Design a protein with these regions (language model features):
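A short acidic-Thr-Gly-centered motif at the start of a beta-strand
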Residues: 215-223, 353-354, 407-420
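Short beta-strand micro-motifs enriched in acidic
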Residues: 285-289, 348-352, 427, 501
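Conserved N-proximal alpha/beta basic substrate-recognition cap immediately N-terminal to
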Residues: 70-203
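Phosphate-binding site of ATP-dependent enzymes
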Residues: 241-329
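Pepsin/retropepsin-fold aspartyl endopeptidases
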Residues: 398-542
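C-terminal active-site "lid" helix and adjoining low-complexity regulatory extension at the edge
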Residues: 9-15, 46-47, 51-56, 319-322, ...
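Active-site nucleotide/adenylate-binding loops and adjacent lid/helix of ATP-dependent enzymes
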Residues: 15-25, 34-60, 64-68, 76, ...
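Protein kinase-like catalytic core scaffold
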Residues: 232, 294, 343, 362-365
Length: 542
Protein backbone atom coordinates (compact mmCIF):
# COMPACT_ATOMS: atom_id res chain seq x y z
CA UNK A 1 0.00 0.00 0.00
CA UNK A 2 1.42 3.37 -1.03
CA UNK A 3 0.87 6.24 1.42
CA UNK A 4 -0.27 8.44 -1.46
CA UNK A 5 -3.42 6.29 -1.70
CA UNK A 6 -4.21 6.47 2.02
CA UNK A 7 -7.55 8.05 2.88
CA UNK A 8 -7.95 7.22 6.56
CA UNK A 9 -5.98 6.81 9.77
CA UNK A 10 -7.02 3.16 9.89
CA UNK A 11 -5.20 2.57 6.61
CA UNK A 12 -2.08 4.14 8.10
CA UNK A 13 -2.12 1.57 10.87
CA UNK A 14 -2.77 -1.24 8.44
CA UNK A 15 0.19 -0.10 6.35
CA UNK A 16 2.56 0.03 9.31
CA UNK A 17 0.95 -2.84 11.23
CA UNK A 18 0.24 -0.61 14.24
CA UNK A 19 -2.41 -1.59 16.76
CA UNK A 20 -4.04 1.62 18.03
CA UNK A 21 -3.65 2.18 21.75
CA UNK A 22 -6.27 4.51 23.18
CA UNK A 23 -5.09 5.51 26.64
CA UNK A 24 -7.51 8.43 26.91
CA UNK A 25 -10.50 6.22 26.07
CA UNK A 26 -9.55 3.73 28.78
CA UNK A 27 -9.54 6.53 31.37
CA UNK A 28 -12.77 8.11 30.21
CA UNK A 29 -14.53 4.90 29.29
CA UNK A 30 -16.33 6.50 26.35
CA UNK A 31 -15.09 4.07 23.70
CA UNK A 32 -14.18 6.83 21.23
CA UNK A 33 -10.91 6.74 19.30
CA UNK A 34 -8.48 9.56 19.96
CA UNK A 35 -6.70 10.83 16.87
CA UNK A 36 -3.85 12.49 18.78
CA UNK A 37 -2.93 9.23 20.53
CA UNK A 38 -2.92 7.37 17.23
CA UNK A 39 -0.80 10.02 15.58
CA UNK A 40 1.61 10.16 18.50
CA UNK A 41 2.03 6.38 18.45
CA UNK A 42 2.64 6.35 14.71
CA UNK A 43 5.20 9.14 14.78
CA UNK A 44 7.12 8.05 17.85
CA UNK A 45 7.19 4.28 17.28
CA UNK A 46 7.65 4.16 13.53
CA UNK A 47 9.34 7.38 12.49
CA UNK A 48 10.98 8.53 15.73
CA UNK A 49 9.30 11.92 15.30
CA UNK A 50 7.67 13.60 18.27
CA UNK A 51 4.14 14.76 17.40
CA UNK A 52 4.08 17.23 20.29
CA UNK A 53 7.14 18.97 18.86
CA UNK A 54 5.54 19.29 15.44
CA UNK A 55 2.35 20.57 17.04
CA UNK A 56 4.30 23.24 18.96
CA UNK A 57 6.04 24.30 15.77
CA UNK A 58 2.67 24.64 14.00
CA UNK A 59 1.53 27.21 16.54
CA UNK A 60 4.20 29.56 15.19
CA UNK A 61 5.11 28.44 11.66
CA UNK A 62 2.78 27.17 8.93
CA UNK A 63 5.59 26.41 6.50
CA UNK A 64 9.10 25.11 7.10
CA UNK A 65 11.51 25.16 4.16
CA UNK A 66 14.74 23.21 4.56
CA UNK A 67 17.66 23.55 2.16
CA UNK A 68 20.05 20.69 2.70
CA UNK A 69 22.92 18.86 1.02
CA UNK A 70 23.67 15.26 0.13
CA UNK A 71 26.58 15.36 2.59
CA UNK A 72 24.12 15.85 5.47
CA UNK A 73 22.93 12.27 5.09
CA UNK A 74 21.87 11.51 8.68
CA UNK A 75 19.78 14.64 9.14
CA UNK A 76 18.34 14.29 5.64
CA UNK A 77 16.97 10.86 6.53
CA UNK A 78 15.18 12.30 9.56
CA UNK A 79 13.83 15.21 7.51
CA UNK A 80 12.56 12.93 4.76
CA UNK A 81 10.84 10.77 7.39
CA UNK A 82 9.07 13.81 8.78
CA UNK A 83 8.01 14.88 5.28
CA UNK A 84 6.62 11.40 4.65
CA UNK A 85 4.70 11.47 7.93
CA UNK A 86 3.23 14.89 7.19
CA UNK A 87 2.18 13.81 3.71
CA UNK A 88 0.49 10.75 5.16
CA UNK A 89 -1.36 12.78 7.76
CA UNK A 90 -2.61 15.14 5.10
CA UNK A 91 -3.83 12.26 2.96
CA UNK A 92 -5.51 10.75 6.02
CA UNK A 93 -7.22 14.08 6.74
CA UNK A 94 -5.69 14.26 10.20
CA UNK A 95 -5.04 17.39 12.24
CA UNK A 96 -3.07 20.09 10.41
CA UNK A 97 0.64 20.29 11.19
CA UNK A 98 3.26 22.49 9.46
CA UNK A 99 4.00 21.98 5.78
CA UNK A 100 7.61 20.84 5.53
CA UNK A 101 9.49 21.23 2.26
CA UNK A 102 12.98 19.79 1.85
CA UNK A 103 15.16 20.77 -1.11
CA UNK A 104 18.61 19.39 -1.97
CA UNK A 105 20.89 22.37 -2.56
CA UNK A 106 22.72 20.91 -5.55
CA UNK A 107 19.50 20.46 -7.56
CA UNK A 108 17.41 23.43 -6.46
CA UNK A 109 16.14 26.17 -8.74
CA UNK A 110 13.77 29.12 -8.35
CA UNK A 111 11.61 31.53 -10.30
CA UNK A 112 10.64 34.97 -9.02
CA UNK A 113 7.36 36.49 -10.22
CA UNK A 114 6.29 39.69 -8.44
CA UNK A 115 5.52 38.62 -4.87
CA UNK A 116 5.64 34.88 -5.63
CA UNK A 117 8.73 32.70 -5.40
CA UNK A 118 8.67 29.21 -6.91
CA UNK A 119 11.23 26.81 -5.43
CA UNK A 120 11.77 23.39 -6.99
CA UNK A 121 14.14 20.48 -7.30
CA UNK A 122 13.83 16.99 -8.81
CA UNK A 123 11.27 15.91 -6.20
CA UNK A 124 9.17 18.94 -5.30
CA UNK A 125 7.86 22.32 -6.43
CA UNK A 126 6.60 24.84 -3.90
CA UNK A 127 5.19 28.34 -4.44
CA UNK A 128 5.41 30.83 -1.58
CA UNK A 129 4.45 34.50 -1.40
CA UNK A 130 5.99 37.39 0.48
CA UNK A 131 2.88 37.45 2.68
CA UNK A 132 4.10 34.18 4.25
CA UNK A 133 7.24 35.76 5.70
CA UNK A 134 5.67 35.95 9.17
CA UNK A 135 4.69 32.27 9.37
CA UNK A 136 7.55 30.59 7.50
CA UNK A 137 10.83 29.28 8.87
CA UNK A 138 13.72 28.75 6.44
CA UNK A 139 16.48 26.39 7.57
CA UNK A 140 19.73 26.40 5.57
CA UNK A 141 21.53 23.20 6.50
CA UNK A 142 25.13 22.12 5.95
CA UNK A 143 26.72 22.86 2.59
CA UNK A 144 24.05 25.21 1.24
CA UNK A 145 26.56 28.05 0.92
CA UNK A 146 28.59 25.86 -1.49
CA UNK A 147 25.80 25.90 -4.08
CA UNK A 148 25.44 29.26 -5.83
CA UNK A 149 21.82 28.79 -7.01
CA UNK A 150 20.67 27.71 -3.56
CA UNK A 151 22.59 30.51 -1.89
CA UNK A 152 20.80 32.96 -4.16
CA UNK A 153 17.37 31.56 -3.19
CA UNK A 154 18.11 31.72 0.52
CA UNK A 155 19.36 35.31 0.18
CA UNK A 156 16.21 36.15 -1.78
CA UNK A 157 13.97 34.78 0.97
CA UNK A 158 16.11 36.49 3.59
CA UNK A 159 15.75 39.83 1.84
CA UNK A 160 11.97 39.34 1.64
CA UNK A 161 11.78 39.20 5.44
CA UNK A 162 11.71 35.42 5.97
CA UNK A 163 13.34 34.05 9.10
CA UNK A 164 16.46 32.16 8.02
CA UNK A 165 18.47 29.83 10.25
CA UNK A 166 21.16 30.66 9.45
CA UNK A 167 21.82 33.57 7.04
CA UNK A 168 24.12 32.16 4.37
CA UNK A 169 26.70 34.95 4.46
CA UNK A 170 27.43 34.20 8.13
CA UNK A 171 27.05 30.44 7.85
CA UNK A 172 29.68 30.53 5.10
CA UNK A 173 32.15 32.11 7.52
CA UNK A 174 31.42 29.52 10.20
CA UNK A 175 31.88 26.72 7.65
CA UNK A 176 35.37 28.01 6.83
CA UNK A 177 37.68 27.32 9.76
CA UNK A 178 40.22 29.97 8.80
CA UNK A 179 37.61 32.72 8.34
CA UNK A 180 36.12 31.68 11.69
CA UNK A 181 39.53 31.99 13.34
CA UNK A 182 40.02 35.46 11.85
CA UNK A 183 36.56 36.49 13.09
CA UNK A 184 37.34 35.24 16.60
CA UNK A 185 40.67 37.05 16.53
CA UNK A 186 39.02 40.35 15.58
CA UNK A 187 36.45 39.86 18.33
CA UNK A 188 39.05 39.19 21.02
CA UNK A 189 37.81 35.63 21.65
CA UNK A 190 40.47 33.30 23.15
CA UNK A 191 41.50 30.56 20.71
CA UNK A 192 44.61 28.49 19.88
CA UNK A 193 47.28 30.22 17.77
CA UNK A 194 46.64 29.52 14.08
CA UNK A 195 47.84 30.06 10.53
CA UNK A 196 46.60 29.40 7.01
CA UNK A 197 48.48 26.73 5.04
CA UNK A 198 48.41 26.11 1.29
CA UNK A 199 50.72 24.28 -1.08
CA UNK A 200 52.23 27.59 -2.22
CA UNK A 201 52.97 28.62 1.37
CA UNK A 202 54.44 25.20 2.22
CA UNK A 203 57.06 25.40 -0.53
CA UNK A 204 57.88 29.10 -0.12
CA UNK A 205 61.13 29.53 1.84
CA UNK A 206 60.05 32.90 3.24
CA UNK A 207 56.29 32.45 3.77
CA UNK A 208 56.43 29.01 5.40
CA UNK A 209 58.56 29.92 8.45
CA UNK A 210 56.59 33.16 8.87
CA UNK A 211 53.37 31.14 8.93
CA UNK A 212 54.69 28.67 11.49
CA UNK A 213 55.81 31.51 13.75
CA UNK A 214 52.18 32.59 13.93
CA UNK A 215 51.43 29.20 15.53
CA UNK A 216 54.59 28.89 17.62
CA UNK A 217 56.35 32.12 18.57
CA UNK A 218 59.52 30.11 19.32
CA UNK A 219 59.50 28.21 16.03
CA UNK A 220 63.16 27.60 15.12
CA UNK A 221 63.82 28.30 11.46
CA UNK A 222 67.43 27.12 11.47
CA UNK A 223 67.35 24.06 13.75
CA UNK A 224 64.33 21.94 12.78
CA UNK A 225 65.09 19.36 15.49
CA UNK A 226 64.03 21.88 18.13
CA UNK A 227 60.51 21.86 16.67
CA UNK A 228 59.96 18.09 16.82
CA UNK A 229 57.97 18.04 20.07
CA UNK A 230 55.66 20.89 19.13
CA UNK A 231 52.14 19.44 18.81
CA UNK A 232 49.65 20.87 16.35
CA UNK A 233 46.26 20.17 14.82
CA UNK A 234 45.80 20.36 11.05
CA UNK A 235 42.27 20.89 9.72
CA UNK A 236 40.78 21.08 6.25
CA UNK A 237 38.93 24.40 6.09
CA UNK A 238 35.49 23.02 5.21
CA UNK A 239 35.66 19.77 7.18
CA UNK A 240 32.76 18.91 9.48
CA UNK A 241 31.81 16.26 12.01
CA UNK A 242 35.45 15.67 12.93
CA UNK A 243 36.50 14.71 9.39
CA UNK A 244 39.64 16.17 7.83
CA UNK A 245 41.33 16.72 11.21
CA UNK A 246 44.87 15.51 11.95
CA UNK A 247 46.92 15.58 15.15
CA UNK A 248 50.66 15.66 14.51
CA UNK A 249 53.93 17.17 15.71
CA UNK A 250 56.90 19.12 14.41
CA UNK A 251 58.66 15.93 13.37
CA UNK A 252 55.89 14.48 11.21
CA UNK A 253 53.76 17.42 10.13
CA UNK A 254 55.75 18.31 6.98
CA UNK A 255 55.21 14.82 5.57
CA UNK A 256 51.51 15.03 6.50
CA UNK A 257 51.17 18.32 4.62
CA UNK A 258 53.02 16.96 1.58
CA UNK A 259 50.66 13.97 1.48
CA UNK A 260 47.54 16.14 1.71
CA UNK A 261 48.71 18.45 -1.06
CA UNK A 262 49.76 15.49 -3.23
CA UNK A 263 46.17 14.21 -3.05
CA UNK A 264 44.69 17.65 -3.77
CA UNK A 265 47.04 20.58 -4.52
CA UNK A 266 44.14 23.05 -4.11
CA UNK A 267 43.40 22.06 -0.50
CA UNK A 268 43.47 24.87 2.05
CA UNK A 269 44.29 24.08 5.67
CA UNK A 270 44.44 25.73 9.04
CA UNK A 271 47.17 24.77 11.50
CA UNK A 272 46.46 25.33 15.19
CA UNK A 273 48.68 24.94 18.20
CA UNK A 274 47.48 22.01 20.32
CA UNK A 275 46.59 23.31 23.75
CA UNK A 276 46.46 21.17 26.90
CA UNK A 277 42.79 20.28 27.31
CA UNK A 278 41.16 19.59 30.65
CA UNK A 279 39.01 16.66 29.49
CA UNK A 280 36.69 16.87 26.47
CA UNK A 281 35.28 20.00 24.93
CA UNK A 282 31.92 21.64 25.62
CA UNK A 283 29.26 22.33 23.00
CA UNK A 284 27.00 25.28 23.82
CA UNK A 285 23.85 25.92 21.77
CA UNK A 286 23.01 29.63 21.72
CA UNK A 287 19.99 31.47 20.36
CA UNK A 288 20.65 35.13 19.53
CA UNK A 289 17.60 37.33 18.99
CA UNK A 290 17.29 41.06 18.40
CA UNK A 291 17.31 42.07 22.05
CA UNK A 292 18.22 38.95 23.99
CA UNK A 293 20.42 35.87 23.99
CA UNK A 294 19.57 32.46 25.40
CA UNK A 295 21.84 29.51 26.15
CA UNK A 296 19.58 26.67 25.02
CA UNK A 297 21.68 23.74 26.16
CA UNK A 298 25.23 22.64 26.85
CA UNK A 299 26.94 19.28 26.98
CA UNK A 300 30.44 18.01 27.56
CA UNK A 301 31.73 15.69 24.85
CA UNK A 302 34.03 12.97 26.11
CA UNK A 303 36.56 11.57 23.65
CA UNK A 304 36.35 7.97 22.48
CA UNK A 305 39.34 5.84 23.46
CA UNK A 306 42.57 7.21 22.00
CA UNK A 307 40.83 9.56 19.56
CA UNK A 308 41.67 13.19 20.32
CA UNK A 309 38.47 14.36 18.59
CA UNK A 310 35.30 14.62 20.66
CA UNK A 311 32.58 14.61 18.00
CA UNK A 312 29.48 12.70 19.09
CA UNK A 313 28.94 11.78 15.43
CA UNK A 314 32.21 9.84 15.64
CA UNK A 315 31.15 7.90 18.73
CA UNK A 316 32.22 10.19 21.56
CA UNK A 317 29.91 10.20 24.57
CA UNK A 318 28.06 13.22 25.92
CA UNK A 319 27.38 14.19 29.51
CA UNK A 320 25.72 17.02 31.38
CA UNK A 321 27.83 20.03 32.26
CA UNK A 322 27.38 23.21 34.30
CA UNK A 323 28.97 26.14 32.54
CA UNK A 324 31.23 28.49 34.45
CA UNK A 325 30.44 32.23 34.22
CA UNK A 326 33.47 32.63 31.95
CA UNK A 327 32.26 29.87 29.61
CA UNK A 328 28.79 31.41 29.45
CA UNK A 329 30.27 34.81 28.62
CA UNK A 330 32.53 33.37 25.91
CA UNK A 331 29.65 31.41 24.33
CA UNK A 332 27.32 34.41 24.27
CA UNK A 333 29.97 36.81 22.95
CA UNK A 334 31.03 34.35 20.24
CA UNK A 335 27.45 33.69 19.15
CA UNK A 336 26.72 37.41 18.92
CA UNK A 337 29.89 37.92 16.92
CA UNK A 338 28.80 35.22 14.46
CA UNK A 339 25.51 37.10 13.76
CA UNK A 340 23.71 33.74 13.48
CA UNK A 341 20.36 33.31 15.25
CA UNK A 342 21.16 29.72 16.25
CA UNK A 343 24.65 28.31 16.46
CA UNK A 344 26.73 25.99 18.59
CA UNK A 345 29.98 27.21 20.11
CA UNK A 346 32.63 24.58 20.88
CA UNK A 347 34.67 25.56 23.95
CA UNK A 348 37.68 23.65 25.23
CA UNK A 349 38.58 24.05 28.92
CA UNK A 350 42.34 24.23 29.44
CA UNK A 351 44.42 22.73 32.19
CA UNK A 352 44.83 25.44 34.82
CA UNK A 353 47.91 27.55 34.19
CA UNK A 354 48.84 25.77 30.94
CA UNK A 355 48.53 28.99 28.93
CA UNK A 356 48.39 32.21 30.94
CA UNK A 357 47.72 34.35 27.85
CA UNK A 358 44.58 32.42 26.86
CA UNK A 359 43.20 31.81 30.33
CA UNK A 360 41.02 28.83 31.24
CA UNK A 361 39.02 28.33 28.01
CA UNK A 362 39.44 28.60 24.25
CA UNK A 363 36.91 28.49 21.42
CA UNK A 364 37.58 25.78 18.84
CA UNK A 365 34.76 26.33 16.35
CA UNK A 366 31.42 27.95 15.62
CA UNK A 367 28.85 25.59 14.12
CA UNK A 368 26.30 27.09 11.73
CA UNK A 369 24.50 23.78 11.23
CA UNK A 370 25.03 22.02 14.55
CA UNK A 371 24.23 18.37 14.98
CA UNK A 372 21.99 17.57 17.92
CA UNK A 373 23.19 14.03 18.61
CA UNK A 374 22.93 13.24 22.31
CA UNK A 375 21.82 16.69 23.45
CA UNK A 376 18.22 15.72 24.34
CA UNK A 377 19.37 12.79 26.46
CA UNK A 378 21.89 14.95 28.28
CA UNK A 379 19.54 17.81 29.17
CA UNK A 380 16.64 15.50 29.98
CA UNK A 381 14.13 17.09 27.59
CA UNK A 382 13.59 17.30 23.86
CA UNK A 383 16.01 19.86 22.42
CA UNK A 384 13.68 20.76 19.54
CA UNK A 385 11.02 21.72 22.07
CA UNK A 386 13.53 23.83 24.00
CA UNK A 387 14.40 25.69 20.79
CA UNK A 388 10.81 26.10 19.64
CA UNK A 389 9.70 27.40 23.03
CA UNK A 390 12.04 30.37 22.51
CA UNK A 391 10.51 31.23 19.11
CA UNK A 392 7.28 32.65 20.45
CA UNK A 393 7.50 35.93 18.54
CA UNK A 394 8.90 35.70 14.98
CA UNK A 395 9.27 39.50 14.94
CA UNK A 396 12.32 39.07 17.14
CA UNK A 397 14.16 37.76 14.08
CA UNK A 398 13.12 40.25 11.47
CA UNK A 399 16.10 42.52 11.95
CA UNK A 400 18.43 39.96 10.42
CA UNK A 401 20.91 41.53 8.06
CA UNK A 402 19.52 41.90 4.56
CA UNK A 403 21.42 41.81 1.29
CA UNK A 404 22.03 45.12 -0.49
CA UNK A 405 23.65 45.80 -3.84
CA UNK A 406 26.95 47.64 -4.01
CA UNK A 407 25.02 50.52 -5.58
CA UNK A 408 21.64 51.63 -4.20
CA UNK A 409 19.45 54.73 -3.87
CA UNK A 410 19.21 56.39 -0.45
CA UNK A 411 16.89 59.08 0.85
CA UNK A 412 18.12 61.79 3.21
CA UNK A 413 15.69 63.86 5.25
CA UNK A 414 17.43 67.20 5.80
CA UNK A 415 14.57 68.68 7.82
CA UNK A 416 12.35 71.70 7.03
CA UNK A 417 10.40 69.54 4.59
CA UNK A 418 13.42 68.76 2.38
CA UNK A 419 13.91 65.11 1.40
CA UNK A 420 16.27 64.17 -1.38
CA UNK A 421 17.21 60.94 -3.11
CA UNK A 422 20.87 60.18 -3.82
CA UNK A 423 22.76 57.47 -5.67
CA UNK A 424 25.01 55.71 -3.16
CA UNK A 425 27.96 53.39 -3.36
CA UNK A 426 28.05 50.81 -0.56
CA UNK A 427 31.48 49.90 0.79
CA UNK A 428 32.34 46.33 -0.22
CA UNK A 429 35.52 46.09 1.80
CA UNK A 430 37.76 49.15 1.41
CA UNK A 431 37.12 50.05 5.03
CA UNK A 432 36.33 53.75 4.56
CA UNK A 433 36.75 55.60 7.85
CA UNK A 434 33.56 57.64 7.36
CA UNK A 435 30.51 57.75 5.14
CA UNK A 436 30.40 60.85 2.97
CA UNK A 437 28.02 62.88 0.80
CA UNK A 438 28.39 65.48 -1.96
CA UNK A 439 26.77 68.78 -0.96
CA UNK A 440 28.23 71.13 -3.57
CA UNK A 441 29.82 74.41 -2.49
CA UNK A 442 29.84 74.95 1.25
CA UNK A 443 30.99 77.72 3.60
CA UNK A 444 32.90 77.00 6.79
CA UNK A 445 32.71 79.60 9.55
CA UNK A 446 34.03 78.83 12.98
CA UNK A 447 32.54 75.55 14.14
CA UNK A 448 29.67 75.62 11.65
CA UNK A 449 29.26 74.79 7.96
CA UNK A 450 26.55 76.02 5.58
CA UNK A 451 25.37 74.67 2.21
CA UNK A 452 22.22 74.55 0.09
CA UNK A 453 19.90 71.60 -0.62
CA UNK A 454 16.95 71.92 -3.00
CA UNK A 455 17.19 75.72 -2.82
CA UNK A 456 17.10 75.85 0.97
CA UNK A 457 20.06 76.82 3.13
CA UNK A 458 21.15 74.52 5.96
CA UNK A 459 23.71 75.15 8.71
CA UNK A 460 25.23 72.29 10.73
CA UNK A 461 27.64 72.05 13.63
CA UNK A 462 31.05 70.67 12.72
CA UNK A 463 31.52 67.69 15.03
CA UNK A 464 34.88 66.49 13.72
CA UNK A 465 37.20 65.87 10.80
CA UNK A 466 38.32 62.84 8.83
CA UNK A 467 41.33 62.33 6.58
CA UNK A 468 40.70 60.68 3.20
CA UNK A 469 43.29 59.51 0.68
CA UNK A 470 42.73 59.88 -3.05
CA UNK A 471 43.93 57.42 -5.68
CA UNK A 472 47.33 59.13 -5.86
CA UNK A 473 47.62 58.89 -2.04
CA UNK A 474 47.04 62.61 -1.47
CA UNK A 475 45.41 63.33 1.90
CA UNK A 476 42.32 65.54 2.16
CA UNK A 477 40.73 66.86 5.33
CA UNK A 478 36.95 66.46 5.43
CA UNK A 479 34.38 68.07 7.71
CA UNK A 480 32.04 65.72 9.59
CA UNK A 481 28.46 66.69 10.41
CA UNK A 482 25.39 64.84 11.70
CA UNK A 483 22.81 64.07 9.02
CA UNK A 484 19.28 64.11 10.55
CA UNK A 485 18.08 60.93 8.83
CA UNK A 486 19.18 58.50 6.10
CA UNK A 487 16.97 55.72 4.74
CA UNK A 488 18.15 52.72 2.71
CA UNK A 489 15.41 50.34 1.64
CA UNK A 490 13.03 49.92 4.59
CA UNK A 491 15.61 50.82 7.22
CA UNK A 492 16.61 54.16 8.64
CA UNK A 493 19.40 55.56 10.78
CA UNK A 494 19.15 58.93 12.55
CA UNK A 495 21.86 61.44 13.51
CA UNK A 496 24.32 59.79 11.13
CA UNK A 497 27.86 61.14 11.16
CA UNK A 498 28.97 61.83 7.58
CA UNK A 499 31.82 63.69 5.95
CA UNK A 500 30.83 66.30 3.37
CA UNK A 501 32.58 66.86 0.04
CA UNK A 502 32.05 69.23 -2.85
CA UNK A 503 30.80 67.84 -6.16
CA UNK A 504 33.15 65.39 -7.86
CA UNK A 505 33.14 63.72 -11.25
CA UNK A 506 31.95 60.41 -9.83
CA UNK A 507 29.03 58.11 -10.64
CA UNK A 508 27.60 58.29 -7.12
CA UNK A 509 26.75 61.08 -4.68
CA UNK A 510 27.06 59.15 -1.42
CA UNK A 511 29.42 56.58 0.08
CA UNK A 512 28.05 54.39 2.88
CA UNK A 513 30.84 52.82 4.93
CA UNK A 514 30.69 49.39 6.57
CA UNK A 515 29.99 50.70 10.06
CA UNK A 516 26.88 52.51 8.83
CA UNK A 517 25.80 49.44 6.87
CA UNK A 518 26.12 47.36 10.02
CA UNK A 519 23.97 49.87 11.93
CA UNK A 520 21.36 49.66 9.18
CA UNK A 521 21.51 45.86 9.21
CA UNK A 522 22.74 45.31 5.65
CA UNK A 523 25.51 43.26 4.09
CA UNK A 524 26.67 44.03 0.56
CA UNK A 525 26.69 41.80 -2.48
CA UNK A 526 29.77 42.65 -4.54
CA UNK A 527 28.12 41.22 -7.67
CA UNK A 528 24.75 42.98 -7.76
CA UNK A 529 23.32 46.50 -7.83
CA UNK A 530 19.90 47.86 -6.83
CA UNK A 531 18.64 44.87 -4.88
CA UNK A 532 16.72 47.09 -2.46
CA UNK A 533 15.92 50.13 -4.58
CA UNK A 534 15.08 50.87 -8.24
CA UNK A 535 17.79 52.20 -10.49
CA UNK A 536 18.08 55.97 -10.81
CA UNK A 537 20.20 58.45 -12.70
CA UNK A 538 22.87 60.34 -10.81
CA UNK A 539 21.43 63.54 -9.36
CA UNK A 540 23.52 66.52 -10.36
CA UNK A 541 24.33 68.91 -7.53
CA UNK A 542 24.40 72.56 -8.61
Amino acid sequence: MNYRNIESVEQLYEMYNIKPVNMLTEKKGDGKADENVKQTTFLKDKLEVNYADLKEVSNIFKHIIVFTNDRDEKNNKTLKNIVEAINEFKKAKCEIIPELHVFVAADVDSKEDESEITIKDDEEEFVITEQNNTDTLVIARLGVQDEYDCEHIVKLLQDRGFLVLNPVQYAAIACNKYETAVLLQKGGIPQPNFTLMTKDILYDEKLFPEAMKEVFADWDVKDKDKNEDKEMVIKILDGHGGTGVFLTNGKKFYAVLQTIFAINPETQLIIQKKEEADGGDIRVHVLTLNDRQVILAAMKRVKLGGDFRSNVSLGASAEKVKLTPEQEQIALKTAKLSKMPWCAVDIMPLVKGSNKELGDNVVLEINASPGTDGISEVIGENFVRVLINQLKDPKEFYLQDKIAGYRESVTIDWGNGVKKEYLAKLDTGNGSSASHIEVGKYTEKGKKVTFTVEGKEFTFDIIGHSVAKTGNQEEHDRIIIKIPSLRLGLRQVNDLEMAIVESRDKSTNVLINRETLSNLGYVVSSRQTHILTPEMEKIKIV
